[in-house]
Amino acid sequence: MAPRLGIFLLWAGVSVFLPLDPVNGDQHLPGRFLTPAITSDDKCVFPFIYKGNLYFDCTLHDSTYYWCSVTTYYMKRWRYCRSTDYARCALPFIFRGKEYDSCIKEGSVFSKYWCPVTPNYDQDRAWRYC
């Protein structure tokens, strides 16, 4: 009885951790057993459109890890984001009709420095904290 139980436990353990299906960028990735990996050397394209939404930065939409499209219109070509991929401040920029050349606190609910990721915040309203 003990050898059979040992073989069963070994089989059950291997079955849990064995990847059974290939994964591509069009699927929702279960984050429990996967770690982020770069899928290609292509660069992120910002802004990009995914499922009708415009993204100016890496996103968690339909994923456990931040990712980006490598085409302007998402066509199942994507990769996980690296630290160098996230949106950068667009300096100088326009906010409430005035031009700025550095991060500002003006307009911040939490009094934190921020900047837009496009040259005209008034038009695009895409921003990030500095």
UniProtKB/Swiss-Prot annotation:
Subcellular location(s) per record: Secreted
Domain Fibronectin type-II: 39-83, 84-130
Family: Belongs to the seminal plasma protein family.
Location (main, coarse): secreted
Species classification: Eukaryota, Metazoa, Chordata, Craniata, Vertebrata
Signal sequence extent: 1-25
Disulfide bonds, paired cysteine numbers: C44-C68, C58-C81, C89-C115, C103-C130
Keyword line: Disulfide bond, Fertilization, Repeat, Secreted, Signal
GO biological process, any: sperm capacitation
One Gene Ontology cellular component: extracellular space
Tissue spec: Component of seminal plasma.
Organism: Sus scrofa (Pig)
Record protein name field: Seminal plasma protein pB1
InterPro entries linked to this entry: FN_type2_dom (IPR000562), FN_type2_sf (IPR036943), Kringle-like (IPR013806), Seminal_plasma_PDC-109-like (IPR016356), SP_Capacitation_Regulator (IPR051666)
Role this protein plays: May form a complex with spermadhesin AQN-1 which possesses phosphorylcholine-binding activity.
Top-level taxon: Eukaryota
